[in-house]
Swiss-Prot record:
InterPro entries, A to Z: A-crystallin/Hsp20_dom, ACD_IbpA/B, HSP20-like_chaperone
Name the record gives this protein: Small heat shock protein ibp
SUPFAM superfamilies: HSP20-like chaperones (SSF49764)
Protein family per UniProt: Belongs to the small heat shock protein (HSP20) family.
Occurrences of domain sHSP (ranges): 35-150
Coiled coil: none
């Protein structure tokens, strides 16, 4: 099972040399050793539509709705995929000449600063689109505290001086 976590920490610019450094290192070693890359998690895009609305799009071709699980717990969004019929398909085939399409189980966790509410999830043409909102609860918003100084306190202080 592959696993990837996401957080709203400041990220490096996409055009930066370091923006995709781990995937690039993984691909270099995979090419040198002939092994498959370690990062088998689905590719995804995360968009901020406005101040509170977000859209997450995952590329998961070959997965059906019943093989996917989307859950929210507090401020964490989890998307999991588990292929069900892969073993039966492999038994029907005598010998692979090349096997480049691999359906691994995956789990993606996205941690946000505040609780989120999923509004809609759609699966179309191998893309899972999840629309959600992330709002700061009123009790967690910063509040301005005003300081009142009554006139009597000012007068007493003037008399003492």
């Amino acid at each position: 099972m592959s696993y990837r976590s996401f957080s709203f920490l400041p990220n490096i610019d996409q055009n930066s040399v370091f923006s995709n450094r781990f995937n690039q290192i993984d691909k270099i070693f995979s090419t040198l050793t002939g092994e498959k890359p370690l990062s088998d998690t689905p590719a995804y895009n995360l968009f901020q539509i406005d101040e509170h609305k977000y859209e997450l799009i995952l590329s998961i071709p070959g997965y059906e709705e019943k093989e996917l699980d989307i859950s929210v717990h507090n401020s964490q969004l989890t998307v999991q995929g588990k292929k069900q019929n892969q073993e039966n398909d492999d038994k029907k085939i005598k010998k692979y000449l090349h096997k480049g399409i691999i359906f691994n189980d995956f789990s993606l966790n996205f941690n946000f600063d505040h609780k989120i509410q999923v509004k809609k999830a759609e699966l179309f043409s191998g893309l899972l689109k999840i629309n959600f909102e992330c709002r700061v609860p009123d009790e967690e918003k910063p509040k301005k505290i005003f300081i009142n100084i009554p006139n009597k306190v000012k007068e007493i202080e003037k008399n003492k001086i």
